[in-house]
Amino acid sequence: MVPAARAQTELEQGGGTGTRVADRSATDTAVPVDIVTAETLQNAGVTELNQALSVALPSFNFPRPGLADGTDTIRPATLRGLAPDQTLVLVNSKRRHASALVNVNGTIGRGAAAVDLNTIPTGAVQAIEVLRDGASAQYGSDAIAGVINVRLKEASEGGEVTVSYGFRDSSYTIPTGTAPAGANWSAPGKVTRDVSDGETTTVTAWKGLPLAGDGFLTLALEYKDQARTERDGYDVRQQYPLIDGAFDPREATINRFNAWYGEPEVQQLTLFGNFGKELGNGASLYGWASYQDRDAKSAGFYRRALDARNVIAIYPDGFLPIIAPEVRDYSAAVGVDWQWGDWAMDASVVFGFNEMMYTIENTLNASLGATSPTVFDAGGFDYGQTVFNVSGVRQLDTGVFASPLNVAVGMEIRRESYSITAGEPDSYRNGDPTKASGSQVFPGFQPGDVVDDSRTATGVYVDFEANLTDRLLGSAAIRAEDYTDFGSNLSGKLALRYDFTDNFALRGSVQNGFRAPSLPQQYFAATSTNFIGGVPFDIKTFPVSDPRAAALGATPLDAEKSVNYSLGAVAQLGPVSLTVDAYWIDMKDRIVLSENLTQSQVRTYLESLGFIGVSGGRFFVNGVDTETQGVDVVINWPIETEGAGRFDITLVGNWNETEVTRVPPLSDALSALFPAGSTPPLFGRVNVLTYEEGNPKDKYAANLNWSLGQFGATLRATRYGEALTPGTTEATDFTLKGKTLVDLEARYDVNDMIRVALGADNLTDEYPDAYPASLNGTGNTPFSNYSPFGRAGRFLYGRVTVKF
């Protein structure tokens, strides 16, 4: 990250992120805006946009969970410790579509369906502006934690090709459990593994072309081939059925590192194009389009040979089921801006679509016995969004303020759609009531899960900004939105900045915001079938509109609401720039995924209402209130020397704390089914503590960039504070101690066209603390999914860039 003044990011008509004043730089706004340049992204040494931002921004975290179904492939990121879908993502100041995946497993971001930033190739990016402040009154739903605005390259000439190759060179030590009495295999107590895996090749290219004279067409391509990593544990459990009361001899020779717990296998192709063309008379045409094809593979838990979920005739040694999602992502935008009297006008249409379809491999449907297929089409889901936007900006010389009053007005119409496609029948059906139904690890979506719904949202806004005096900047915005499914919302924002001197200012804002319930949260459905006494019972993730969900207490979802306060200081101390921003975010009615309500009392209650064969399930619900407070600090210090080159030092820090102040209660009808004191929670201990302590409360980073002639280097240290992996009881909680990761890269310019780089991410090969054996029952997962930096170890890489 670099100072906004040095980034020199050219702001398009309508202003930069957080302001609609066309010539307002990010350093002069009343709200905190960071700028991450394309050079910073490239020098980060990583191949994912989310991961690059996590090392550049103080309050941005990108955990990398494993064994989490589709979340292994589309991983959520968080800003200021809030949910992934509470940060709005824009491309060239236009709303980006979300992914179709809603995270339903036990990871950070459970219940959220967020934008997948990794659908945008780094080669297409000129800079990324990050507004660390709520902005619902300016941009609409989702902008509670902040706004990420990706600025695309606008080049009519030149180009670049970058090829990088890297791999994991690592070693980790983990405890093991105890083998059963009389076992013919050993449990060493502790084991160290030396690994070399995760080979990743990335090719990124962009080319600028002239378009009809004075226009530009910038094309970008990225291809990524990533091999999996395996950071599994030692599975000390019995694997085979007993033979005449004795352990099978194969127990002594089977590979007990039998999981793929780590980074997924990924093959990904991304194309991006951005264009602009002057039309004359102050008008111009612009637009962009993108396409991504991502094929990934990750694994579930190992099914042992003796498991009831296995069929010995198919897998005599057990099997590792593979989840192989196919993700397709498309977007296109076209717009025109023109001058209408004193108004700078803009109109655009933006379309986005994301689809995720599941193939389940190396698995079986145990209820079909030896005739079961081993590969299944399990169905999937998709999400689409079309946004029409028209806006106008002008300046009025009121004679009252120290500057003209900037007035911005606009209207936005957004159409969203969401659908679920059923899998093939063998992926979900049951052929034997004594066996589990469906494809192991991920049963297919059933016909009863199929949905195809849509909604329309209409919003209007007005935004004012002016220098009230020579030293006082003020802005105000108000936005009204109406949704066809849940109702309307009104958001407002006030922001002030007072420059005491040319080198010191205070800034602050107050606002209310909202996030509309996403379509996946309203309509996602999935079914697994369990047999109780030979009778099939469905355990479902219900859409809130399902009558069975209503019987369990579900109600139509409403918007999440927030009140944000921020107060900050901006100082220029000679060459050193300093920003300190404190924030407080009070959220009401956060949308969460409930606990699974599958107790026998629930099943009996549902049967009494006529819902036969349903043993309960879970659903999305409003009702969690939280308070989040924190401080962001950013220090930039450029140093020019005569003989030692240039040094750019950046220090960033974030302290963040969230408290859950209210959880939704179980319905009165269900509460009455349980004895006093034994009522199950609707939102339980694990989920509450995930909100409060699942993210580190503090994160600090020091970054040094050095350049001298043809040579350059980056040295970065990032300190992640403690995080908690919560258990169902305090005795099963596990605290991840703070860790410091060091990254190092060296660069050399062979000539004006060719640059080579060598580097290491996580140079010292740090890992999160390993679970004790008592908390790792299967032995497969020695590390927590709550680790803020993953658990892949050291990554060594080389990179060659050719400019033309």
Regions found by a protein language model. Name each.
Residues 94-132, 178-182, 195:
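Short acidic/polar hinge/loop motifs at secondary-structure boundaries
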